[in-house]
Amino acid sequence: MSKFWNERVKKLEPYVPGEQPKDQKYIKLNTNENPYPPSPMVIEAIKKEADYKLKLYPDPNCDSLKRTIAEYYGISDKEVFVGNGSDEVLAFSFMTFFSPRKTVFFADITYSFYKVYANLLNLNCELIPLKEDFSLDLDNFCRCNGGVIIPNPNAPTAKYIGLSDIKKILDWNKDSVVIIDEAYIDFGGESAVKFIKDYKNLLIVQTLSKSRSLAGLRIGFAMGSPELIEGLSRVKNSINSYTLDRLAIVGAEAAFKDKEYFEDARRKIIATRERVSTELKQIGFKVIESKANFIFISHTTISAESIFNELRKRGILVRYFKTARIDNFLRVSIGTDKEMSEFMDKIKECIA
C-alpha cells in the first residue's frame, strides 16, 4: 500500500473482471461475451471511418448515435445518453443521482461493480437479500431510500423481473431515481423503455457488449427523461467530453441498423441456452431459469469449485464466485452450438 494513496483509495476493493487469457487454448464461457462476430455492416463502417478523419476529435455529444438509438427505441434523442461502455454510464449515474445523505438500495447478489461504485463515492448502501430462489424481494425495495438499482435480468443469477414488478417499484419510488440495468435484456426479456414517458425518475442503462457483439469497442447508453440525461451530461463533461471515439460511434450506429443480423444471432443464443439448460438438468444440475446469454448452475452432489477447476484443466473457462449464498454455483456464458457441445462433453467428464 503506497504512502501516496489518499485514504479513500486505501479503503477501496476494486472490481475484479473475469479472466482474459492471453492465449487461445480455452473456450471462454466466463465473461458473457457474444460468441458470434459483429455484423459485417459494423466492420465495413469502421473500415470506412479509419482514414484521415482520425486526426480529428469525435463529436463530443455523439448526436448521430443518439438519433440512431432514439429512432430504434421510439424515443427522443434528448432522452438518450451514451458513454464508454455501460460501466462508465453506471459510474456517471451513481455520481449524478445518489448522495451520501440517503441510502441506495440494491440486492445482495447482483453485479458486484455497484458496491465498488458506492464505496468509491462514499455512498451509504443497503444490500437487500434476494429470496431463497434468487427472486427479488419486491416489498423491501418499496421503502424510503435515496435511489434503487436493479439489473434485469440479474447478474449473475440470470433471473428476470416482469414489467409489472418494475412498475410497482417505480410507483413507490417517485422521489428517487430507479436505475434498471438492462445489459442482458435482449435475450428474452422485455425492456422497461416504454415507461420512460410516464416516470421521470426511471433511467435505463444498456450496452452493445452483449447482444451486439461489441465488447471490444466499449459502448453503453442510458435512456431516461431529459432532466436525467442532462444531469449525466453535466457529470460526463466535468470528467471527459470525448468518451466515444470515431470508430466506436460509427460501429454502434451500424450495429443498430443491421436488425436482421442482430435478430439471427439473438435467436441462436437463446436456442442454444435452452438446449444446454435441458441437457444439464438431465445430468443432475439445477439450472436457474435464464433470460440472459448465460446460465447459473449448481450440481446436486459435486461442488461448484471442483467443477470449475476440472473444467479449466480441460480448457473450458466459466465463472465461479467464492461468495456467500452462491459459492456452489457456476455462471456459464452461452457460446456457439459447437462450443456448448464441447462444454457438455467436458462437464460430463467432471461429474463422472
Swiss-Prot record:
SUPFAM superfamilies: PLP-dependent transferases. InterPro entries: Aminotrans_II_pyridoxalP_BS (IPR001917), Aminotransferase_I/II_large (IPR004839), HisP_aminotrans (IPR005861), HistidinolP_aminotransfase (IPR050106), PyrdxlP-dep_Trfase (IPR015424), PyrdxlP-dep_Trfase_major (IPR015421), PyrdxlP-dep_Trfase_small (IPR015422). GO terms for biological process: L-histidine biosynthetic process. The keyword Amino-acid biosynthesis applies. It comes from the Bacteria. Pfam families: Aminotran_1_2. It is an enzyme of class 2 (transferase). It catalyses: L-histidinol phosphate + 2-oxoglutarate = 3-(imidazol-4-yl)-2-oxopropyl phosphate + L-glutamate. Pathway: Amino-acid biosynthesis; L-histidine biosynthesis; L-histidine from 5-phospho-alpha-D-ribose 1-diphosphate: step 7/9. Its EC number is 2.6.1.9. The modification N6-(pyridoxal phosphate)lysine is found at K210. GO terms for molecular function: histidinol-phosphate transaminase activity; pyridoxal phosphate binding. Keywords: Amino-acid biosynthesis, Aminotransferase, Histidine biosynthesis, Pyridoxal phosphate, Transferase. Its cofactor is pyridoxal 5'-phosphate. NCBIfam families: hisC. Belongs to the class-II pyridoxal-phosphate-dependent aminotransferase family. Histidinol-phosphate aminotransferase subfamily. Homodimer. This is Histidinol-phosphate aminotransferase.
